[in-house]
Amino acid sequence: MTMSLPTRYLGTIALTLALGAVFYIGTFLYQIGALVSAEYWIYDAQVVKHELLARNQDKNKLIFAAGSSAFFGIDSQRVEQALGMPTINLGLHIGRPVHFLLNEMTPYLKRGDVVVLPLEYEHYRATTPYSEWFTNQVMAWYPEYFWQLETTEKLRFLRSVLPQRVLLGVLAKLMGD
């Protein structure tokens, strides 16, 4: 049985697209964790804040979770002195989506804890949790976040990453980070 010209043409297009998708996904996965330009200080600060959460896990505590407005605008020590309750400020950067903020603190919460979310305007108007800034940070210094996502969320994440960023990560890996 001979295939008609349009069928062969469409088959060739479908095969090319499938091979292109497999190649792109492979390069995307290869470059995750590449040492590219990113805000690594946020990772370091996040580790410290998680240690504070763990240290106060069994106590009733007050937690502020937001972006840099909380980071720069809320003095945890003063709040703690005024209220007599351990206070932890998880504020770091506006680019961290709300679901990320919530997932970050949830393992450390217990009944009686108070969480305050003084969110920035951008948190309310974001159309996707995967901004260019956020995906770059995750791929550079927090690949565990990507790997723990459900498959459909991994695909949403992958679709939100610019091809130029994938290329940058591949080049960094090939050059030995």
Regions from the language model: what does each represent?
Residues 148-177:
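Extended, charge-rich helix/loop segments that form flexible
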